Amino acid sequence: MRKLALVPIRFYRYAISPLMASHCRFYPSCSCYAYEAIENHGLLRGGWLTFRRLGRCHPWNPGGYDPVPPIPTSRSSSMAE
């Protein structure tokens, strides 16, 4: 399911995005963010992170560096160290 969700993002990045002027105010771009978020966090959480990121992408937001949050580690593995 995750790989299927990444197909439209890949299509946009390689077929549509090069035809448009660069508009993204964030680094990485929103499409790169969406791809990485879904790939790392899965369809549900990655989709939610992407939805929130797209909500921040507007003219009144200064943009800047906004990476995908790291995958949370479980407390039991961090306590064992």
From Swiss-Prot:
<keyword id="KW-1003">Cell membrane</keyword>
<comment type="similarity">
    <text>Belongs to the UPF0161 family.</text>
</comment>
<keyword id="KW-0472">Membrane</keyword>
<feature type="region of interest" description="Disordered">
    <location>
        <begin position="61"/>
        <end position="81"/>
    </location>
</feature>
<dbReference type="Pfam" id="PF01809">
    <property type="entry name" value="YidD"/>
</dbReference>
<keyword id="KW-0997">Cell inner membrane</keyword>
<dbReference type="InterPro" id="IPR002696">
    <property type="entry name" value="Membr_insert_effic_factor_YidD"/>
</dbReference>
<comment type="function">
    <text>Could be involved in insertion of integral membrane proteins into the membrane.</text>
</comment>
<protein>
    <recommendedName>
        <fullName>Putative membrane protein insertion efficiency factor</fullName>
    </recommendedName>
</protein>
<dbReference type="GO" id="GO:0005886">
    <property type="term" value="C:plasma membrane"/>
</dbReference>
